[in-house]
Amino acid sequence: MKITALLVLKCAPEASDPVILSNASDVSHFGYFQRSSVKEFVVFVGRTVASRTPPSQRQSVQHEEYKVHAYNRNGLCAVGFMDDHYPVRSAFSLLNQVLDEYQKSFGESWRSAKEDSNQPWPYLTEALNKFQDPAEADKLLKIQRELDETKIILHKTIDSVLARGEKLDSLVEKSSDLSMASQMFYKQAKKTNSCCTIL
């Protein structure tokens, strides 16, 4: 999963082209001679997708092996270039955080921007690096991943207990937690299952 670029743009309905307010990209996985062309292409596609994203809307556009996600919050638009495997919910969560941070840092000054800004915004570069892992952008995904890891550990623990030479049958017989009826049910179910396996 890879984020190639993040852009923040002013998308005014009366303007012909969106104005780039901030831009961060990581094109290190491209060949050295391709990098400048890739950056130009990111700006072109980002501007095009942003201009076609209506206010208060989100959209995703497939382009080759990339998805371009855009979120236009009343004229302030965030665009992200991610690979196909980056979860959509995490992508939009990241774009939402980028817009929140931009408005905290710059307020409404973006409304008066008339031309592209070349001034770097450190937060956007940090976000590009930090959110390469989608779980950082999406807290629910992070919690789900932790639960999955816990479940894997639990399965390993049960398997290791049974792998020490103890059999489930002997554990059932020794258990004081199970009533005689439960023990009989277990033995009967095991006989029934073994009967079916032979057939």
UniProtKB/Swiss-Prot annotation:
GO terms for biological process: protein transport; vesicle fusion. Its main location: membrane. Coiled coil: none annotated. Expressed ubiquitously in roots, stems, flowers and leaves. One of its GO terms (cellular component) is SNARE complex. A lipid is attached at residue 196 (S-geranylgeranyl cysteine). It comes from the Eukaryota. A lipid is attached at residue 195 (S-palmitoyl cysteine). Gene3D superfamilies: 1.20.5.110, Longin domain. Keywords: Cell membrane, Lipoprotein, Membrane, Methylation, Palmitate, Prenylation, Protein transport, Transport. Transmembrane segments: none annotated. Residues 139-199 form the v-SNARE coiled-coil homology domain. InterPro entries: Longin-like_dom_sf, Longin_dom, R-SNARE_YKT6, Synaptobrevin-like, V_SNARE_CC. The modification Cysteine methyl ester is found at residue 196. SMART domains: Longin (SM01270). PROSITE patterns: LONGIN, SYNAPTOBREVIN, V_SNARE. It is a lipid-anchor. Residues 197-199 form a propeptide. Residues 7-133 form the Longin domain. It holds the Pfam family Longin. May be involved in the secretory pathway. Essential for membrane fusion mediated by either SYP41 or SYP61; triggers the fusion of phospholipid vesicles containing SYP41 or SYP61 and VTI12. Interacts with SYP41. Core constituent of the SNARE complex required for membrane fusion at the trans-Golgi network. PANTHER family: SYNAPTOBREVIN HOMOLOG YKT6. Belongs to the synaptobrevin family. This is VAMP-like protein YKT61. It comes from Arabidopsis thaliana. The lineage of its organism: Eukaryota, Viridiplantae, Streptophyta, Embryophyta, Tracheophyta.
